[in-house]
Curated annotation (Swiss-Prot):
HAMAP family: Thymidy_synth_bact. Pathway: Pyrimidine metabolism; dTTP biosynthesis. GO terms for biological process: dTMP biosynthetic process; dTTP biosynthetic process; methylation. Homodimer. This is Thymidylate synthase. It comes from Methylocella silvestris (strain DSM 15510 / CIP 108128 / LMG 27833 / NCIMB 13906 / BL2). Its EC number is 2.1.1.45. InterPro entries: Thymidate_synth/dCMP_Mease, Thymidate_synth/dCMP_Mease_dom, Thymidate_synth/dCMP_Mease_sf, Thymidylate_synthase, Thymidylate_synthase_AS. It comes from the Bacteria.
Length: 269
């Protein structure tokens, strides 16, 4: 995960101070890209311990089309608690946009089901996109989408293996707390879609707009940079699962994850 540490290092060296919505203040860079070969291991940061259970259950929650934190709470995940209202609702956030985008004529569009169908029907299409950025719904969202657009790509490599890539565009990225989580989440999504579509995982490409370190995360970021990355773990997926929407936590296993200890930092709300 040297690619991730390089991002942290660049922000610390070149970031400019900017005010932000939370009032915390940031060091920020604009326009940055990382690439991860999923064949080299699952890109779960090893220079601090991440909560695998939260990563998996949040993605399952998105794929369910859910926008209430009840499912997350039932599974011991509290990462969305700060933004939910008293009934646990978040408004039309990721799950709604992914699975039930509201069309002007009253229809709802299941972007995830559509993109899987398209991968299977026309794998070399350049229209394999999913967007969570719906301007009409932004005012009703508890938090505007940070990771707002992703695109799949199918290609045959030099050995004739058909691979699935994914590129994420993230308009805003909390480099210390959020980015490691986002890397793992979209790498997992790539692996899952590849599995149900009979493809081999290829590259995960992570493109940022504003990538930043909050000013109260600087010491933690420097501590993380002082640690040497360890070998990446391997992800195993239950091969009996044929639908993306049937995935359960128990269908996934992470092998040989040996991270450095957790580094705590406050969440900017």
């Amino acid at each position: 995960m040297q690619a991730y540490l390089d991002l942290i290092d660049k922000i610390l060296r070149e970031g400019v101070r900017k005010p932000d919505r939370t009032g915390t203040g940031t060091l920020s860079i604009f326009g940055y890209q990382m690439r991860f070969d999923l064949g080299a291991g699952f890109p779960l940061v090893t220079t601090k311990k991440l909560h695998w259970k939260s990563i998996v259950h949040e993605l399952i929650w998105f794929l369910r089309g859910d926008t209430n934190i009840g499912y997350l709470k039932d599974n011991g995940v509290g990462i969305w608690d700060e933004w939910a209202d008293d009934s646990g609702d978040l408004g039309p956030v990721y799950g709604r946009q992914w699975r039930s985008w509201q069309a002007p004529d009253g229809r709802t569009i299941d972007q995830i089901a559509n993109v899987i169908d398209e991968i299977q029907r026309d794998p070399f299409s350049r229209r394999l996109l999913v967007s969570a950025w719906n301007p009409a719904d932004l005012p009703a969202m508890a938090l505007a989408p940070c990771h707002c657009l992703f695109q799949f790509n199918v290609r045959d490599d030099s050995t004739g293996t058909r691979r699935l890539d994914l590129q994420l565009y993230q308009r805003s990225g909390d480099a210390f707390l959020g980015a490691p989580f986002n890397i793992a989440s979209y790498a997992l999504l790539t692996e899952l879609v590849a599995s149900v579509c009979g493809l081999t995982p290829g590259d995960f490409v992570h493109t940022f707009g504003d990538a930043h370190l909050y000013l109260n995360h600087i010491d933690q970021a420097k501590l993380q940079l002082s640690r040497d990355p360890r070998p990446l773990p391997r992800l195993r997926i239950n091969g009996n699962v044929k639908s993306l929407f049937d995935i359960r936590f128990e269908d996934l296993s992470l092998e040989n994850y040996d991270p450095h200890p957790v580094i705590k930092a406050p969440v900017a709300v």
